[in-house]
Amino acid sequence: RIAAALTALALCDSVAHADSPAFPETSYRKHIEVLSSDAFEGRAPGTEGEQKTLAYIEQQFRAAGLKPGIGDSYLQSVPVVEIMPHADAAMHVVGAGGKSLEVRSPDDVVVWTKRPVPSTGIENAEVVYAGYGIVAPEYGWDDYAGLDVRGKLVLALVNDPGYATQDPKLFTGNAMTYYGRWDYKFAEALRHGAAGLLVIHETKAAGYPWDVPRNGASKPQFDLLIDDYEAKRLALEGWITEDAASRVLSAAGMDFAALKKASSTRGFRGATTGMKASMSVRNDVRKATS
């Protein structure tokens, strides 16, 4: 969103100097320096920093002679919600034979929700392994084929099969596609009726170490304020380390290394683990207008 605003601001400078209408790099850099300064406090929605940002953008629009597009305003109000998660200390996983283990937060797993509620979670949700959690018809790929994940917790590998195999003929090889993104995987799991999804973290495939999702999960989540959120947002989203995922699958009698390798082959089918997981997340919820 800020990139679009910066582009608009730079174009304003072009309009203001119509004798040389080329896109001015110096103006773009100037606006970046201003908006990224400490004075704008991070520009988060619903904060004083956002108000300063909006005032600056509006000032630049007026200086360029642009006409307001929404009545006498340049701005459109958007209802948003800020959700600050406070996850339980552990996810409790139990097998069919009574074998249990704990996957602890934040060293093994991190979770959050975009449901604007004081608390949510899963209880005795069946754990399902879904390969990369991808449905990509143009690549002839469907990790959910024949797999019922309704009301269940899905485990899915980060990135896509092309990266794992380095095969340029599989997806786009080393270059990650949209299907490799974690937010896509959450959306796909939701479309299939899952209660939650944990992305299995691997530093090279993700492009960043575990510290990134671990630290990110302790920060507020911002989302549009929507109706029918239970149908439009997972109860739980999050990440799990490779080691923790391996322990869960091992408790189910499954070999994670073998599963991971098989997941990159065309025609792979996910599987139910027979394990059941419980975990909850408590939230501080604040509604705002951005």
PLM segments and residue spans:
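Active-site-adjacent bridging/hinge elements
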Residues: Y28-I32, Y163-T165, T265-A271
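Hydrophobic alpha-helical scaffolding
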Residues: P21, R43, T47, A175, ...
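Noncatalytic luminal/extracellular "stalk/propeptide" segments of secretory-pathway proteins
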Residues: E41-P168, T273-K276, S280-S290
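Extracellular/luminal Protease-associated
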Residues: P24, R104-L236
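NTP/phosphate- and nucleic-acid-binding module
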Residues: S20, G180-R181, A277-M279
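Long, well-ordered, tryptophan-enriched scaffold segments
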Residues: R191-K204, Y208, R214-T289
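Bacterial N-terminal signal peptides
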Residues: A3-S14
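N-terminal hydrophobic or amphipathic helices/low-complexity stretches enriched
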Residues: A16-G69, A244-A245, A251
